[in-house]
Amino acid sequence: MGRTLESKQQIVEELKGLLGEAEMALVLDYQGLSIKEMSDLRTRLQASNGVCKVTKNTLMRHAINGNGAWSNLESLLTGTNAFVLIKGDVGGAVKAVQAFQKDTKKSETKGGLFEGKLLSQGEIKAIGDLPTKEVLMAQIAGSLNALATKVAVGINEVPSGLARALHQHAESGES
């Protein structure tokens, strides 16, 4: 027996809620994946605030209808799709999907949408290759610390150089 109209409307409302919170969406061809593999993907995505939803393209079409930010997603709604909706750690979620695809070798990314722009597979891969927010903050902190150290050494070098010059002048005067 098929889904009732109420259950379909409930699914569409849930999708609208997830899309409202999401920063990025990936569309995966999940054909050939087992339930265990889909559960594995969902588990991997939890750490980076990603959600994997398998739903009919028609229901997703209803969810994005009238929402300009997600309207470009419609061009990817063909075939058997799993939708990865990401909020928060976009790079981490993309890395999780890429690691999953590398491990299973069954799923492929059809495309994605970030800030209303359709992304190619190359652009999605580039996002996955970006360092995490924590790594970037550590790199910036290291750069700032190195700059402060160089300034401190430079400021300290002026009196040290003057002291060495005076010492050398005093020694040459004694001879």
Curated annotation (Swiss-Prot):
Superkingdom in the source lineage: Bacteria
InterPro entries: Ribosomal_uL10 (IPR001790), Ribosomal_uL10-like_sf (IPR043141), Ribosomal_uL10_bac (IPR022973), Ribosomal_uL10_bac_type (IPR047865)
An annotated GO cellular component: ribosome
CDD domains: Ribosomal_L10
GO molecular function: large ribosomal subunit rRNA binding
GO annotation, biological process: translation
UniProtKB keywords: Ribonucleoprotein, Ribosomal protein, RNA-binding, rRNA-binding
Subunit details: Part of the ribosomal stalk of the 50S ribosomal subunit. The N-terminus interacts with L11 and the large rRNA to form the base of the stalk. The C-terminus forms an elongated spine to which L12 dimers bind in a sequential fashion forming a multimeric L10(L12)X complex.
Family the UniProt entry places it in: Belongs to the universal ribosomal protein uL10 family.
Function of the protein: Forms part of the ribosomal stalk, playing a central role in the interaction of the ribosome with GTP-bound translation factors.
Name the UniProt record assigns to this protein: Large ribosomal subunit protein uL10
Organism: Prochlorococcus marinus (strain MIT 9313)
Gene symbol of the encoding locus: rplJ
